Amino acid sequence: MRWLIPRLGTFAQAHPNITLHLHSAGGPLDLATAGVDVAIRRNDFFWGHTLAAEPLADEWIGPVGSPASFDTPHPKQLHTRTRPQAWQDWQRATRKSPIDANTTTPPFEHFYLSLQAAGAGLGAAIGSVYMVSDELDAGRLIAPSGFVRDGSAYVALAREPFAANPARETLLHWLRSALAESASKWISRETQADTRDAIP
């Protein structure tokens, strides 16, 4: 939602005949009961064998914070309960040294709260390039170490193949294009090539 909502106007202008109704949810998927046509999720859980799945984009993560947060060489590390291994995933991908426990803080309940705290100058959080691209554009956040793949990806899920529904397929192609555009501003081709080999 953090990434999608600011871009809904662009989608509506390009596709005025398609109306999107958004639902924010997590946990087990039951698209039929929820009345949902398409779910956007990370592929870090098992969704069963009955759903059609289409890849959207690899996940790219990196430490982000306000410019002032990085005035110190070791800003406090912000954690979240919904992505408890985020710092470890980044360290694995970059082969950085282990976390110094003295620079950590109690975890936030949700991922987006840790990003909000990072923007408020409370420390550095591991951010998804998609979730923070607008803040990076505006200069509210910086990412001194750049971004690396964490081994996960975003997928679009539906009850039937996307090609069976023109509106659903249109949304799929738009999501892929918009995600790629967001990432391309902050991830160079050289970085993509280097980090593809770094993820086991």
Where are the regions a protein language model picked out?
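Hydrophobic hinge/microswitch elements
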Residues: 99-144, 149
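C-terminal effector-binding regulatory domain of bacterial HTH transcription factors
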Residues: 130-138, 147-200
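Central regulatory/effector-binding core of bacterial HTH transcription factors
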Residues: 1-46, 191-200
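Hydrophobic/proline-rich hinge and linker segments of small-molecule sensing/allosteric domains
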Residues: 41-93, 156-159
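Short, well-ordered beta-strand core segments
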Residues: 37-39, 77, 125
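A local structural motif
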Residues: 15-21, 95-105
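Tryptophan-centric aromatic hotspots in well-structured domains and transmembrane helices
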Residues: 3, 47-48, 84-93, 108, ...
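Ligand-binding cleft/hinge of the Venus flytrap
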Residues: 9-11, 86-101
